[in-house]
From Swiss-Prot:
NCBIfam families: PRK01699.1
UniProt-listed Pfam families: FliE
Entry keyword set: Bacterial flagellum
HAMAP family named in the record: FliE (MF_00724)
PANTHER family attached to this UniProt entry: FLAGELLAR HOOK-BASAL BODY COMPLEX PROTEIN FLIE, PTHR34653
Family designation: Belongs to the FliE family.
Subcellular location field: Bacterial flagellum basal body
Keyword Transcription: no
Name of the protein described by the UniProt record: Flagellar hook-basal body complex protein FliE
Main localization, broad class: other
A Gene Ontology cellular-component term: bacterial-type flagellum basal body
GO biological process, one term: bacterial-type flagellum-dependent cell motility
Amino acid sequence: MAIESINAASVLPKVTLGETAKTDNAAGAGNTFTQMLDSMSDTQSNAQTSVSNLLTTGEGNASDVLIQMKKAESEMKTAAVIRDNVIESYKQLLNMQV
């Protein structure tokens, strides 16, 4: 069994000086955040509908409604933490000296 040498120039990507990073990742992160907010909105509306149905018509199970409410609450808390982190990062950017 022979060991072949590896040509690093052919394996590694070619990077030139002054090349900037692609901004596709930033757009992807924005889309991911938007999808998370849409999902959170759907969860909130489903929880509200479940509570309304349980109270008005008696449809549904109380434990399932409680689980949906807790899930909606946890998603709301997560969104609030992300919002707070974004605001804090923005404030730090404003305070940076150029």
